[in-house]
Regions:
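C-terminal, non-catalytic tails of nucleotide-sugar-dependent glycosyltransferases
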Residues: 2, 39-40, 54-125
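Histidine-centered active-site/metal-ligand motif
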Residues: 49-50
């Protein structure tokens, strides 16, 4: 992520509740979305060195369930957020400012499904 420091400070950077494990990237994007950021640039030609959780693999650290954490925090899972808010993984979707998602029947039913999952996990917590 390449984010201006003022914006990073405004949204609070990565949330500790998603560390260690997964979910910190979609959480940061959701916090940016909630702060009215609508321009997300994807760069297709770059090198990334990812060491595949080398720290957590060597120790007895219990990983979080990022999908569950995200669901409990925002009321829907990261897949739903990526699909309807960030318009999926297609780089051609990122040519202009993103707009609020348009509610379709499919989106509505997926949102209802997410809400059932949310209440299920809330009851179990």
């Amino acid at each position: 992520h390449l984010i201006h420091k003022q914006l990073w400070d405004k949204v609070g950077g990565f949330s500790e509740e998603f560390n260690p494990g997964d979910g910190s990237d979609p959480d940061l994007c959701m916090k940016l979305w909630n702060s009215n950021v609508r321009v997300f640039k994807c760069i297709s030609q770059f090198k990334v060195y990812h060491f595949n959780s080398i720290t957590t693999r060597k120790s007895n650290i219990k990983l979080n369930n990022g999908t569950r954490q995200f669901l409990l925090k925002y009321g829907f899972n990261p897949r739903f957020f990526r699909k309807y808010y960030l318009k999926g993984n297609n780089l051609s979707n990122y040519i202009d400012k993103l707009k609020e998602p348009k509610i379709s029947m499919i989106m509505f039913f997926e949102l209802i499904t997410n809400k059932f999952k949310y209440f299920y996990h809330k009851i179990l917590s």
